[in-house]
Amino acid sequence: MDSLITAAARALATGDLLGALKRVALRDDAPALALRGIAMARLGDLPRAKTLLKSAARAFGPREAVARARCVVAEAEIALVSRDLAFPAKALDTARATLEAHGDRLNAAHAQHLAIRRLLLIGRLDEAERKLAGLDPAPLPAASKAAHELVVAGIAIRRLQIKTARLALTTAARAAREAKIPALLAEVASASNVLNTPAARLIARGRERPLLLEEVEATPASRTT
């Protein structure tokens, strides 16, 4: 790996997205395309990021299975952010298995988080919870810890466990700030807004008032065992 690619990867890891792009902006080799794609995704230009990552995956040779798998994971993340549930779950699972087999545990864990978040979006809570229980967030970098806590919060919100959700989102926000990734910060803020937005209406004695999720959780009809 040459010095510019190494420097760009280091800048990307520390949240210096523009610095990363500056180092590889004029390059079209596979590692540069991949780094550019990831940087563009984090800057919010998802269509451009998707194009770059597809080009990178094609450009990596057959012996570069790990690099191709990382591109697939990055594409899956873009699909998830775009709420494109048509992205093949099998491709993501294959990429995760490849990364695990080659010792890239951090990216394998990231792929698993993406798979779990997809399960949340399609309403398969029990399966998402089982998969989440098998992940230890302690050794993960800040961005992955934020993603983990977003999944915890997502499950808790859907189960009306609002105290758990707030705690997870507080942890996610702290990790997202440490990661310095604008798109991740925005995702945490969006999830937090759900807790502060009326989710139902209470009609009693001819009067109506909005209820936050905490209040919905507190009503007897909403309690689960």
Language-model features: locations:
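Tandem amphipathic alpha-helical repeat scaffolds
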Residues: 9-13, 31-44, 67-84, 107-123, ...
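C-terminal non-catalytic interaction modules
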Residues: 1-22, 90, 94, 130, ...
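Structural signature of tandem alpha-helical TPR/SEL1-like repeats
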Residues: 48-51
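Structural signature of alpha-solenoid helical repeat scaffolds
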Residues: 24, 31, 63-64, 103, ...
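Acidic, Pro/Ser/Gly/Ala-rich intrinsically disordered segments
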Residues: 1-3, 27, 76, 106
